[in-house]
Amino acid sequence: MVCNLAIDAYYGCMADFSHILMTRPDFGDDDREWLHQLVADWQVIADLSFADLLLILQNGEGKYIIAEQCRPSTVMSLRAEDVVGNVVPESLCAELDAAMDSESLFRSSKLRTVGKAKVCNVYAPVRHNGKT
């Protein structure tokens, strides 16, 4: 997923994946461990897709938070800054809602220009124990 987001800092401090996961009261230890395993193995996906990957979760307040980020090593990343812990802007929430409800990949209908590149957000909802 490639996003160019203007975002607010999450709690005004350096975000930590484990801390962000704790904002989900419905996530048990098994859910958190599964997500840690997921992001531990996703570098190869970023490399093969030539794309920045962002793991976006809804926190306990219903806001979408960037919980983890992976940059490809096969191409230059379009995202120079670390966005982990940032709140996703309202302008992308409708797309995220649709992606969370979908049963497969969800591709944005809007192309954006980032630098000299045209990018399209592609969302891949991940589910574990009935949670997205």
Language model regions located:
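PAS-family sensory modules
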Residues: Y11-A51
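A short beta-strand signature within small-molecule sensing/ligand-binding domains used
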Residues: F106, G115-P125
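Cytosolic beta-strand hydrophobic patch enriched in CBS
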Residues: L55-I56, A124-V126
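Structured interaction and signal-relay segments at domain junctions
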Residues: W42-S109
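Short hydrophobic/glycine-rich mini-motifs in sensory/regulatory modules
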Residues: V126-T132
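Short, positively charged and aromatic/hydrophobic N-terminal segments
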Residues: M1-Y10
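Short, compositionally biased low-complexity segments
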Residues: Y10-M22, I66-T74, K131
